[in-house]
UniProtKB/Swiss-Prot annotation:
Pfam families: Aa_trans (PF01490)
Tissues where the protein occurs: Highly expressed in hippocampus, hypothalamus and piriform cortex (at protein level). Expressed in epithelial cells and both inhibitory and excitatory neurons.
Quaternary data: Interacts with CRYBA1.
Family: Belongs to the amino acid/polyamine transporter 2 family.
Membrane topology: Multi-pass membrane protein
InterPro entries, per the entry: AA_transpt_TM
Gene name tied to this protein: Slc36a4
GO biological process: L-alanine transport; tryptophan transport
Name of this protein: Neutral amino acid uniporter 4
Localization: Lysosome membrane
Main location group: membrane
GO MF, one example: symporter activity
Record's function text: Uniporter that mediates the transport of neutral amino acids like L-tryptophan, proline and alanine. The transport activity is sodium ions-independent, electroneutral and therefore functions via facilitated diffusion.
Superkingdom as given in the UniProt entry: Eukaryota
Amino acid sequence: MEAPAPAETAGCEELDMDVMRPLINEQNFDGSSDEEQEQTLVPIQKHYQLDGQHGISFLQTLVHLLKGNIGTGLLGLPLAIKNAGIVLGPISLVFIGIISVHCMHILVRCSHFLCQRFKKSTLGYSDTVSFAMEASPWSCLQRQAAWGRQVVDFFLVITQLGFCSVYIVFLAENVKQVHEGFLGSTPIVSNGSDLSHACERRSVDLRVYMLCFLPLIILLVFIRELKNLFVLSFLANISMAASLVIIYQYVVRNMPDPHNLPIVAGWKKYPLFFGTAVFAFEGIGVVLPLENQMRESKRFPQALNIGMAIVTVLYISLATLGYMCFRDEIKGSITLNLPQDMWLYQSVKILYSFGIFVTYSIQFYVPAEIIIPGVTARLHAKWKRICEFGIRSLLVSITRAGAILIPRLDIVISFVGAVSSSTLALILPPLVEILTFSKDHYNIWMILKNISIAFTGVVGFLLGTYVTVEEIIYPTTAVVAGTSQSPFLNVNSTCITSGL
């Protein structure tokens, strides 16, 4: 992906907070109508417009869509292909990608319809679900419409904090490999004792690296305004783009004979594929905020189709080529398969880790701004800032605890994807369309289509959760990504790698 010009990129990054804000403030929407907003309401076939001073451009929207969908999930897709098969995997990725994009379009269409029906200028995800329940023909749902908003907010918080836990595991595993690769290339002065030599080379537990990142991440999330992260965010985007280019050239240049790869993997592993794939495609949370902020919102479907087409091609190509290159040795992140004795490929892990480190603060923004205002609302002004920093530190510690409990990158990605991403991306949007249009625009084919999509999401949710939990409790492998996955630190060990 070609990097945008610095001036326009600056505009993109400075708008990050404004783009994310509708995701935060929607639960405080008072439901009152505005006369000026009411006068600007137009038929459903048309779209509202923002002036050039406040809206974001088509290119900025496209960049934000790419940023919202490209992360650690992309690097975990080669292992997902292994869990599905070299033929079934790519086909399933196309299928899940098409359904995910369709659900994004569903959400935008329902938001437009409900905006006009309830005379609102814009609606976010939570309010779209709430007003869809209010517009439904069933009185029991109408009375519980407020619960729709709370359910979406809950899954948004769980999803974003889950992303943050994934990032901590990713950072720890990649930095661990770089550190051990550096130690492995450094001559060691030995007294001739094999035991001493073994102790020098013994690996540090993955959780120690997680602990080292904790204060750095806490300091990062103390930056309350995303626009203040512009320079870091811009450098992070460049770093991740450069890393992907290097990864592509490696897998293409080192491609073995692709024969003898399983066309279809065992069915017990397919739920792990589903969780990882849905995790990767779960960018639905940024769709309505972006559409609401776009200057020419009538062009948003075009931006969505172009952006997600790029994302899907990127996903399928890297997933397939990565699995064909590393075969059964593929790990939870393809970066962990790159050579440890060449600094070009070690730099990929450093660069991508830097990008993920900065992205942590962006993903953390949503749950922090949903939780913190409700907790600090009744506090005295002088205590609010202290309490806010305490809550931010606590939330970061919670994400680290989640990473410690599930220190396997592949499993934590599949678990978050199955539990929360499938709910937001596949289950809720088709149900929202049924609730929104069943009263005035009843269509049996629309009902059947949406029930099928929601059923797929529910099955993936149940099977994916079951298989990942089973894998957590009864792991099939004792060593993942080259690190011991024992449930606790070996505090009795007397041999710890130096240089940490």
